[in-house]
Amino acid sequence: MNHPRGERVIDGTFYKRARVEGNELGYNTIAAAGAHACVLHWIRNDGPALSGDLLLLDAGVEVESHYTADITRTIPINGKFTKAQREIYEIVLAAQQAGIDAVKPGAKYRDINNACMKVLAKGLEKLGVLTVSAEQSLNPEVGIHRRWSVHASGHMLGIDVHDCAKARGEQYLDGELAVGHVLTVEPGLYIQPDDLLFPEEYRGIGIRIEDD
């Protein structure tokens, strides 16, 4: 694209489709190109979209019933991943699949996040950036992998994008999934542009993959 305000072009294009196909945007669109993808809720959407960078698009359409979708895709703007981009993408994709596999009636909600985090930690260990083993990092008192994965791997979804977000932990995180529950699975890895623990070619890569 190489547009000086490519993020705004993408934002506006999605808004038009949301209004034509549905009722409204479900929430403020995140159209984050390049290192902006490392900012979790980048909604300024005023940066360029340059060849060689990734675009993280987190967007959803609210339908006439006022229920909303919440989907995230991370794609290479020029259609081709660099080696570093692909390595991070494949870790996140594998983590998301592990989380999806954990979604079933009777499972605890927190099982989804735990499944995702296990894959993310092992992926970071394989890249050689963890200062401890993946198993040690997964200890809640250690959590070194959380430096690059700074949010939970999903949430309940409904009329509110983050439905039941104010619920008590024992009812939400420790609650059991049941038929009819709707939720997202959205692991992510974010390597800040100044993160010296990663080689230079990885810095500024932010990837999240989300499905409902």
State the predicted function of each range.
Residues 1-212:
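Active-site neighborhoods and metal-handling regions in enzymes and metal-associated proteins
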